């Protein structure tokens, strides 16, 4: 409950199928943290494996992934505006990328990745992840977080909202709003609204 304003949900995928399975994934408008405890997935668009544990940035296109063996993965799905509060990094740096946790130069995050991949019990893994983020949250003093929370309330309430209305909800100038939004959400307001509209169209 304490982390619910920051983490939308966790999901765990396990599959021992011997035959490779292909899946098309679409943008969901949220950044994610992915821990592969089994075999990594193969990115068919990029012709490479996903990193073992990585930060998944915002993207606007679909991606085709292929299993390469036994799948066991834990994914943390952040609230759209909350990743910066938990990772302490401007998240626009991850736009369109899957960045290995070891490449972020964050020793605590690398240690978490190792702990999760070395722990067999997934409930214990979730507990380790939550303890890590609670420590991060108490060390974060981002005054723009409440502004971004208000912006996303407006997006959820008004399907056809525009960017000037969002910058007004954030009490920021258009230029300031664009910069703060990218720092917290990992993409531009225009691109994010496009993702939201695509998601709504997919689930109509």
Predicted features by range, described:
Residues 1-149, 153-164, 168-174, 187-188, ...:
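Alpha-helical bundle regulatory/interaction domains
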Residues 184-188, 192-204:
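Terminal helix-turn-helix DNA-binding modules in bacterial transcription factors
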């Amino acid at each position: 409950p304490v982390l619910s304003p920051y983490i939308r949900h966790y999901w765990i995928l396990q599959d021992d199928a011997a035959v490779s399975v292909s899946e098309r994934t679409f943008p969901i408008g949220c950044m994610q943290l992915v821990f592969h405890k089994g075999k990594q997935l193969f990115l068919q668009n990029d012709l490479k494996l996903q990193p073992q544990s990585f930060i998944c940035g915002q993207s606007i296109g679909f991606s085709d992934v292929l299993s390469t063996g036994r799948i066991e993965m834990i994914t943390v799905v952040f609230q759209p505006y909350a990743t910066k509060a938990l990772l302490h990094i401007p998240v626009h740096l991850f736009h369109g990328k899957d960045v290995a946790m070891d490449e972020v130069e964050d020793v605590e995050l690398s240690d978490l990745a190792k702990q999760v991949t070395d722990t067999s019990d997934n409930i214990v893994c979730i507990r380790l992840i939550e303890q890590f983020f609670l420590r991060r949250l108490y060390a974060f003093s981002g005054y723009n977080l409440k502004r971004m929370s208000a912006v996303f309330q407006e997006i959820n309430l008004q399907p056809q909202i525009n960017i000037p209305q969002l910058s007004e909800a954030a009490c920021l100038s258009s230029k300031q709003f664009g910069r703060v939004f990218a720092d917290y959400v990992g993409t531009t307001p225009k691109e994010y609204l496009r993702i939201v509209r695509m998601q709504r169209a997919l689930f109509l």
